[in-house]
Amino acid sequence: MKKSVGLIGNTGRMGGLLTEALRSHPRCLLGKGFSRRSQTLLKEVVLENDILIDFSAPEVTETLMDILLVTPKPVIIGTTGFSDNSVIRDKLSLLSEYVPVIFSPNMSLGAYVQRRLTACAAKLFDASYDVRILETHHRTKVDAISGTALSLAEAICSAKKDHFGDEQEPCIEMFGSRVGNIFGEHEVSFVGKNERFVIRHEAFSRQTFSDGVLIILRKIMEERLPAGYYTSDVLYESLFQEVVFD
């Protein structure tokens, strides 16, 4: 039986891509969606769909959480810009006790591989190496530093703490740029006295983010994910283990 999927932010750039993808999806039905300009109420979208995908704005996401806490449904959240909003994060955590909640600022496979390689590199390059993260996006992107860049910094800090303990807290330089129509570039550099090691990911189109959402959507349906808080990294991990340790 096909699952009905509702898009929150369905008139945005990502919403438009996902709308087209879901219309031809073999296992999903494109249900009612929501945008700030639509006549449909957000509560109505939640009630009439089996799974929700949210690419909206922080204030919309917070309202969505309030509704889902009353009527829990699995949700995939790609909205960015609320990394410092503990209220939304607390609501995500509470909702995850009842249904699968998947949150990721960048759901592309390439972004996952970059974070994985960055964490590995952070354990190999000690405190004698400086760390820098550069991120560039289109001029209309609101949040800076990007959620993806912040997740890279978190991966570095976590990896270094696991490997070196509290004795080596990294100092990370972070820079963001908003120019042109660039979909997303993220570069992590480990710079030593005699060498520089760079891990770089560049998205050529938003299609790579849409493809990642569809991979995660398939996992929700095929693997019957239990209630819990997930990131795209967690869901991609089985693929990484299969490739690396096969």
UniProtKB/Swiss-Prot annotation:
InterPro entries xref list: DapB_C, DapB_N, DapB_N_CS, DHDPR_bac, NAD(P)-bd_dom_sf
Subcellular location: Cytoplasm
Keyword Protease in record: no
Annotated binding of (S)-2,3,4,5-tetrahydrodipicolinate, by residue: H138, G147, T148
List of residues binding NADP(+): R36
Active site, per annotation: H137, K141
Reaction catalyzed: (S)-2,3,4,5-tetrahydrodipicolinate + NAD(+) + H2O = (2S,4S)-4-hydroxy-2,3,4,5-tetrahydrodipicolinate + NADH + H(+); (S)-2,3,4,5-tetrahydrodipicolinate + NADP(+) + H2O = (2S,4S)-4-hydroxy-2,3,4,5-tetrahydrodipicolinate + NADPH + H(+)
Pathway(s): Amino-acid biosynthesis; L-lysine biosynthesis via DAP pathway; (S)-tetrahydrodipicolinate from L-aspartate: step 4/4
Enzyme Commission number, as recorded: 1.17.1.8
Record-level GO cellular component terms: cytosol
A family per Pfam: DapB_N
Entry superkingdom: Bacteria
Enzyme class, spelled out: oxidoreductase
A GO MF label: NAD binding
Database matches in SUPFAM superfamilies: Glyceraldehyde-3-phosphate dehydrogenase-like, C-terminal domain (SSF55347), NAD(P)-binding Rossmann-fold domains (SSF51735)
Record family assignment: Belongs to the DapB family.
Function of the molecule: Catalyzes the conversion of 4-hydroxy-tetrahydrodipicolinate (HTPA) to tetrahydrodipicolinate.
NCBIfam families: dapB
Protein name (Swiss-Prot/TrEMBL): 4-hydroxy-tetrahydrodipicolinate reductase
Species this protein is from: Chlamydia muridarum (strain MoPn / Nigg)
UniProt lineage: Bacteria, Pseudomonadati, Chlamydiota, Chlamydiia, Chlamydiales
